[in-house]
UniProtKB/Swiss-Prot annotation:
Gene3D superfamilies: Aldolase class I
EC code(s) of this entry: 2.2.1.2
Organism whose genome encodes this protein: Alteromonas mediterranea (strain DSM 17117 / CIP 110805 / LMG 28347 / Deep ecotype)
Reaction it catalyzes: D-sedoheptulose 7-phosphate + D-glyceraldehyde 3-phosphate = D-erythrose 4-phosphate + beta-D-fructose 6-phosphate
Protein name: Transaldolase
Length: 319
């Protein structure tokens, strides 16, 4: 009998939201995504101990400056883990730019190019990499410039329609609109204990973005992310891609039956309007309390986990 994970694979590209190679081998996704939080978790796994040691040793050879060594070791480790993962999947690995650069377009471009170079030095072509960038105004501008250089991007921490519109207009390859974190905010703000999957605010948000992209002929890939339960995944079956944690992949694999296609790619019927200006984007974000709060929180959390990872590396660099 078919299970819901197998059924989902027939209608949506399944991506693993983890840095755990054993989980990736088990569920056989097409792509995989990482972020600073997942890298921090992965760095604690015994199978990655040698990668940390190698990154530290390599960084020491690149510079005598302690802070530069830390930056180099961090970048090298992210790429080393990405390379390991890329050997277990047919598709792409997403590696994230330091969240502390989220409001600096030039620095984001520089870091992205550095990560791509390290991947290419490790024998991984840039066609197999997506550079993850927070969906700030500055991040979206960086992504537009990188796309023109042939470096494809995954715009993350996306909570609002304005962010999605700006990404499409910038010609970004892929966006990761968050589902579960939107649900978290609404549950807390409204006191609502639970939502039916089709009424889940995160599901509603991704559905609106998906339909807008398809109606207007945008090529940007929509990859739903950050799920709290399989009901959200079931309600978005048919989305271009869904990036799912190992725990929820397991739940889907244990759920018998087929999934109904919920999102369908209808032919474009509308012409895109004027591009969002920076002031329009910032005003739309200001008017969206949920998106503003969750974007800021997401950047802070990723930055904090990056700093925890660096603390581990700093200790090893000084040993």
């Amino acid at each position: 009998m078919s299970n819901q994970l197998a059924s989902l694979r027939d209608i949506t590209t399944v991506v693993a939201d983890t840095g755990d190679i054993d989980a990736i081998k088990k569920y056989q996704p097409v792509d995989a995504t990482t972020n600073p939080s997942l890298l921090l978790k992965a760095a604690g796994l015994p199978q990655y101990a040698s990668l940390i040691d190698d990154a530290v040793a390599w960084a020491k050879l690149q510079s005598n400056d302690a802070e530069q060594q830390l930056t180099d070791a961090s970048d090298k480790l992210a790429v080393a883990i990405g390379k390991e993962i890329s050997g277990t999947i047919p598709g792409r690995i997403s590696t994230e730019v330091d969240a502390r650069l989220s409001f600096d377009t030039a620095a984001t471009i520089e870091k992205a190019e550095r990560l791509v170079q390290l991947y290419e030095d490790a024998g991984i072509d840039k066609s197999r990499i997506l550079i993850k960038i927070a969906s700030t105004w500055e991040g979206i501008q960086a992504a537009e410039a990188l796309e023109k250089k042939g470096i494809q991007c995954n715009l993350t921490l996306l909570f609002s329609f304005a962010q999605a519109q700006a990404c499409a207009e910038a010609g970004v390859y892929l966006i990761s609109p968050f589902v579960g974190r939107i649900l978290d905010w609404y549950k807390k703000a409204t006191g609502t204990e639970s939502y039916a999957p089709d009424e889940d605010p995160g599901v509603v948000s991704v559905t609106k973005i998906y339909n807008y992209y398809k109606e207007h002929g945008y090529k940007t890939v929509v990859m739903g992310a950050s799920f709290r339960n399989i009901g959200e995944i079931q309600a978005l079956a048919g989305c271009d891609r869904l990036t799912i944690s190992p725990a929820l992949l397991e739940e889907l694999a244990n759920e018998p039956g087929d999934l109904e296609v919920k999102l369908k790619d209808n032919d474009a019927t509308k012409t895109p309007g004027e591009r969002l200006t920076e002031s329009e984007f910032r005003w739309a974000m200001n008017e969206d309390a949920m998106a503003t709060e969750k974007l800021s929180e997401g950047i802070r959390n990723f930055a904090a986990d990056q700093e925890k990872l660096e603390a581990t590396l700093r200790e090893k660099l000084s040993a």
